[in-house]
Amino acid sequence: MSNSAIPLNVVAVQEPRLELNNERTWVVVKGGQQVTYYPFPSTSFSSNQFNFICNPPSAQTVLDRLVFIQVPYDITFTANPSHAGITENLLQPGRDAFRAFPISSITNTLNATINGFPVNIELAQIIHALSRYHTPLKVKNGWMSMQPSFEDNYQSYRDADGANNNPLGVFTSAAGLSELPRGSYTMNVVTNTTTTARITGVLYEQVFLPPFLWDGEQAGGLANLTSLTFNWVLNNNLARIWSHSDITNDVSGNSTIGSMNISFQQPSMYLGFVTPRLNIPIPPRITYPYFKLSRYTTQFQNTLAPNASSTFKSNVVQLDSIPRKLYLFVKQSDNVIYQNLNNQITTPDVFLQINNLNLTWNNQQGILSGASSQNLYDFSVQNGYNKTWSEFNGVTQQFNGVSGQPTKVIGLEGGIVCLELGKDVGLRDDEAEGVIGNFNLQVQMTVTNTNQYVTVTPDMYIVAVYDGTLVISNTSAMASIGVASKEEVLNARITHGVSYNELQRIYGGDFFSSFKNFLGKVGNVAGKVNNFLKDSKIASSVLGAIPHPYAQVPGQILKNVGYGESHVGGGKKKGGVLIGGRQLTKAELRKELKM
């Protein structure tokens, strides 16, 4: 008993150098008996779309969920006649490069069918907002370095000219351990003169589509596959694949690049298949994490001059389920970007500064109206945002060392707010992420145009992420979004045996393997969650007893991870950029095995 005013439990912890336990465990990693990677050339392709049939060699193989596309290209640039007489080559170092995620940037919709079930995502509309989340530098300089991925960080490329963090910079301009600029991406420069330029090469890019993965980590693969197809529907404005600094524009704003001709050769998709060992049976039905993204855009006629602020209100959005997350941002209208070639290649993928946010949720008004922009940044960082406060705030300055000259104001990339419902946005007693019903949402934002050169016509985006499950059986697949009822949420009891952070570490992946593998075998955290699941007999209801939306897991999923009628094993790590959550690292596993 402690001498505290409120008695405390006193425990002892061994100092690491005195952990002298001789008992050790040798870990054997059991992989497949055969691992094979196949290129699947497109069955048809054009400047409008790519089509693939990627049927697995056998339903008894497991598809690696890390999938990427390879696209050979040939691009010709022609100088703008208004720049006749220029003496510099058309493509300039630090002023020309591929856009971040170039294939996704020109993909209106990526469609896939899994055993006949359709899944899709509007890549071009959301990739540059969501890529600011759950993509730390380690990921960018690792797996994601196969594609240009350095996001635009200035409101105008002209402000990035000569900077170490210029997204269009070359390899030699990268400082220290920073992210490689997009100008370092390998290409073959066939010609580059004052009047014309031509580049050829190959672009690689991950498949950013649930239930596939794109963070470089492994997870439970897709099994029971009999058919798999992909359809990439491209934008009519293919020039959006390229970024060009407007610092070389003439006084009328005309770019040095007057035209671009973009052609693709036959693309391929690369998929890996693992044949399990004979003593590792594949269950007839497997449940995977799945999320659906819905985009709601409100366009405005008002314009914002440089440094001007205004308040904008979205249309009322009707939802039939409570989403897990909301991504909110305002950016230059696509109608403006696609007006001409100059706008397409010189407009960075950036956002307006968010000063204030006011939500109306299910007729409750004034939600988060008192939150400062610093609060909104904090919410976003907690939810996986990778950028600094200055970048989120969208503005910085540069002192002028010359007497009498003003300090230069520089516009930075601006903010994307991410809110988690149930944590950042309060919900009623009978509401939680995944609850089915009729809900209305309206967003009001006060924003500032921090671009020091360009007037902005704003579009407001609301991207809702709905969490659910994808069940794949021998011949079919089916997704479920909105899996909890109000009655289950009301009847769920609160437990103090599992903390929010503990649950976050294990949530967000392959349900059929993550809970079973992590919770059932190692660690005190695992034991607490494991015992709670058993003691509360929650396999037939929802994990709403844990005060966080991550805990709203349907009973059927729990049965698939070993609680209830079925019992399935496996191994898994992460669920992808939008989810987060992880299994034990190897270092943590070694530590736990020594305990």
Curated annotation (Swiss-Prot):
Subcellular location per the Swiss-Prot or TrEMBL entry: Virion
This protein's record includes keyword Metal-binding: no
Keywords from the UniProt entry: Capsid protein, Virion
Cellular component, GO annotation: viral capsid
Coiled-coil positions: none
Stated role: May self assemble to form an icosahedral capsid. Most abundant protein in the virion.
Record protein name field: Putative capsid protein V20
